[in-house]
């Protein structure tokens, strides 16, 4: 199959969200006077991931997720806060974190050299993602970057891909490839939209879901081997 349009997920695929979150949370919690920062992180991170899964499954809204996660976490440790205010405060920290994985920039440079058109396709908060991308070194390789909050829809919804297809000149599904680490968002969404996909699986996770990717790779070199 010959592809032209490469749709890249960002977090956990190209951008190192775990490092970004670790740095931002530490700074944020220190400034909030939290005593046991590690205990807070140990509670917050899985809780936050669970909320994002709920959002994928349409159990909650993006606004509810953003405005409730810190209220829930602080409440767990006996402190009542304004969740919306804390969310805005945290944004100032996380949006400064543009760490990418080793080899990500080289991967994108080689793909551009090979004639591919690169587009970002990310679920996230616009202000946060735009800030992080501004701090990163990967942004210049993309023709455009589509953020779920801006589109008013998110992966894995078919509408997310339909909106992207209308915004990319000359786009056809047959020439497109979705690349990402999430079976439930990137791969399930690609399948539903009729777009071939690559499951980026660097941790060699077992796929126990009914979602079947077109390709599976564990590192960037394997991806380059597919996209010769």
Residue ranges and their predicted role:
Residues 1-6, 109-112, 125-228:
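Asp-based, Mg2+/Mn2+-dependent phosphohydrolase catalytic module
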Residues 79, 116, 195:
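Short glycine/serine/threonine/alanine-rich loop segments
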Residues 19-23, 102-106, 131, 158-159:
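Generic recognition of short, well-ordered alpha-helical segments
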Residues 33-34, 78-82, 107, 159-160, ...:
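A broad, low-specificity signal for short, low-complexity segments enriched in glycine/proline
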Residues 2-102:
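N-terminal helical cap/lid subdomain that shapes the substrate entry/recognition surface
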């Amino acid at each position: 199959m010959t592809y032209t349009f490469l749709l890249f997920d960002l977090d956990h695929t190209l951008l190192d969200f775990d490092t970004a979150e670790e740095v931002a949370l530490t700074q944020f919690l220190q400034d909030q006077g939290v005593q046991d920062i590690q205990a807070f992180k140990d509670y917050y991170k899985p809780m936050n991931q669970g909320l994002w899964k709920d959002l994928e499954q349409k159990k909650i809204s993006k606004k509810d997720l953003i405005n409730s996660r810190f209220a829930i976490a602080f409440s767990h440790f006996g402190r009542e806060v304004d969740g919306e205010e804390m969310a805005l405060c945290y944004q100032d920290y996380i949006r400064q974190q543009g760490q990418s994985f080793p080899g990500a920039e080289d991967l994108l440079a080689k793909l551009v050299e090979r004639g591919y058109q690169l587009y970002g396709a990310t679920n996230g908060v616009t202000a946060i993602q735009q800030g992080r991308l501004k701090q990163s070194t990967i942004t210049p390789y993309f023709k455009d970057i589509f953020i779920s909050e801006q589109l008013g829809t998110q992966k894995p919804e078919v509408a997310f891909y339909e909106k992207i297809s209308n915004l990319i000149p000359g786009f056809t599904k047959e020439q497109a490839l979705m690349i990402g680490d999430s079976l439930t968002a990137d791969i399930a969404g690609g399948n539903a939209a009729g777009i071939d996909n690559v499951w980026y699986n660097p941790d060699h996770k077992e796929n126990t879901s009914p979602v079947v990717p077109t390709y599976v790779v564990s590192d960037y070199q394997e991806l380059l081997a597919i996209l010769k």
